[in-house]
């Protein structure tokens, strides 16, 4: 297991637990104002007592203080909903005494290490990125058949001899978790790849074509071809420690680089084959309100399609990257025994094929969690603001914005993880960039021109052309969010001002956009057309936005 997945089991009312932290000897019965959390890590369970009045941030900090699990590596889930608003109290989410929370922790984030010997033999294994080269040598000696002892090894990376104290994570700075190493010592010819990477005959990956009249762009064809080559050459998918769903890094034919990222529908959070052991959704609702389990892949593809380049619509532009820089994404079906098959892999590639999104792997220097937001270029932040507002993103945080460099050396922000875009309502819209200084600066003229070029009706038609029978509630969300963005720039509002209209201040207080929608709904007859309803939304929105400019 590469992730410590914590499924917290219900307890009986007479159970004893530690008060105020983990592993303490004090024994007490919980009160009606208390919440018991059982963390199961590596086979052991650790109880913790919190109060209903605690904020989510306080609970996470207490977990970090008591057991060292860093706050930013924690995700709390209750009753099928992520407790994402750190300033809100646990009771705002409906948590009461005796409730059971689910915690997912990322404790182990491995790198796939490829060792190539002087005689050309190849060996692969996973190494914790926090380990050093000395540890790597011990692993080579212990696990590699015929490899030399530690003292006889000399390891190089890109021609540079590596010191034993060098940290593995610091060697590979471009975000690619495959390190190519050379062992400068003769090794027996019996060294081979591990058996499970020797052949790709039981694997499958192919595009899902929903409309035969739509030709797959060359960039997506190339990404799929390179991914298939990797599988056929025996380079297995590598499960990522990131996220609450199944995410697999797909390698190229050399096994030295990642090409793409595969997210199966049936392994999404709260789906039936979710590898994180989160409970299966009882009503089909996703972790974010207004989304459904199993629809994340469709939304990932939609995000790329609607990220139009400055030069024009995605359907006619030849540019690979759009305005916001969403990586190229396609719908595929794939099978491999590395994926999560609770009932076992049958070795029948077609039978066990999973449908999901395949997104181009982007070289990066980490995420925005690793850098203070003050260092980000204003235009890079604003492009993400525009995208998130328009798509009503319900899951934008610093961890799903990667940082990179352009060919000219300029800082780039790369938005990923769009499975919770275009929800059916605005209840869970969250934009972390609201708290960044760039969000309080006005949009540039170029960005305003781009915003004014957007057309929600064309966007809906484009999604339908690519095979998504867009639910009416989703179409309405896109129409209203696009309307808000355009009306906002007409009034010279900043990203912060527009984004604040979409986001709730607390869990139980409706956002301004929700109030606008409700006002419009109450002002029209039940049988009114969508056009009539949207006109009512426009009137209510004008009044609310005008108040912001007074």
From Swiss-Prot:
Induction: By salt.
Residue ranges of every copy of the PI3K/PI4K catalytic domain listed in the record: 234-532
SMART domains reported in the protein's UniProt record: UBQ (SM00213)
Membrane topology: Peripheral membrane protein
Gene: PI4KG2
One of the GO BP terms on file: response to salt stress
Chain residue ranges for the region called Catalytic loop: 392-400
Family matches, as CDD domains: Ubl_ubiquitin_like, Ubl_ZFAND4
Family statement drawn from the similarity comment of this UniProt entry: Belongs to the PI3/PI4-kinase family. Type II PI4K subfamily.
Region span, G-loop: 240-246
Subcellular location, principal: membrane
Residue span(s) of domain Ubiquitin-like: 34-111, 112-190
Cellular localization per UniProt: Membrane
GO cellular component: cytoplasm; membrane; nucleus; plant-type vacuole
Keywords: ATP-binding, Kinase, Membrane, Nucleotide-binding, Repeat, Transferase
Stretches for region Activation loop: 415-441
Reaction catalysed by this enzyme: a 1,2-diacyl-sn-glycero-3-phospho-(1D-myo-inositol) + ATP = a 1,2-diacyl-sn-glycero-3-phospho-(1D-myo-inositol 4-phosphate) + ADP + H(+)
Keyword field contains Ribosomal protein: no
Function, in words: The phosphorylation of phosphatidylinositol (PI) to PI4P is the first committed step in the generation of phosphatidylinositol 4,5-bisphosphate (PIP2), a precursor of the second messenger inositol 1,4,5-trisphosphate (InsP3).
InterPro entries attached to this UniProt entry: P4KG1-8 (IPR044571), PI3/4_kinase_cat_dom (IPR000403), Ubiquitin-like_dom (IPR000626), Ubiquitin-like_domsf (IPR029071)
Organism annotation: Arabidopsis thaliana (Mouse-ear cress)
GO molecular function (one): ATP binding
Region spans: Disordered: 228-247
Residues binding ATP: 241-247, 263, 359-362, 417
Record protein name field: Phosphatidylinositol 4-kinase gamma 2
